[in-house]
Amino acid sequence: MSSEEFFQAHPVFTHDEYAQSRESASPRTVDSLLRKHVASGRVARVRRGLYVAPTTGASAETVDPFLVATKAAPDAAVSHHAALQFHGRAYSVWSQVTFLTTHATRGFRFGPVEYVPVRPPEQVAQLPDMGGGVECVPSGGGIVRVSTCERAMVDVLHSPMLGGGWEEIFRSLSMVEFFDLDAVITYTLALDSAVTAARVGYFLSSHRERLFVEEAHLARLAKHAPKQARYLDTARAPGRLVHPWNLIVPEWVLDERWEEVT
């Protein structure tokens, strides 16, 4: 395979992937070739060890950002709000892409997009696919590793700041027509967080008809809800105590009156 054939098949690639394609070439030769292609403009360096090869005539910054995130670490998977955006289920389009990884790596910016690594919850970090709910989807000429809508739902409720806050979260999740509820509940319980179980249970109970939520689904989550009243989030905004979740939920969230929030 020639370098050009490799670039056409790999719009985003790592140094190691290119080195493997050069077979018997020495490390020095590989580095020299990459420098040559960067200098010619055929390849652009994203950061150390990570490159993009845009299609002819296109800007390097037009390469699929979800592919870039996938290649940012060996186990990287697009996550949280970015995963919902990938699936076309985000209320707002962001120029930030979060990705799960167990590797120590720094965030970076390439073009207009900020890439933010996120450590998976410690309860699932060492499990296969960091707890599951990660799929591989063709996109932008490559394969994107990305959280399913089910995992993304639970993750943004577990870490609402990574979902953009309650309005963005609820509006985005309301764009999802169907959830595998057993997958949602299984992953939720794996996180071993009473508050997260309550948040997920509250959301499902609030949309039970649309999402075909059965009492048995809610009962599984209710068993793990907090024993004492807890606020919906750390802002401790006043609201109404909602049973059986023992969550104090602000009125504007209860009624989903987003336009009234300033």
Language model: regions and residue ranges:
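Residue-level marker of positions within ordered structural domains that often coincide
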Residues: 23, 88-89, 158, 205
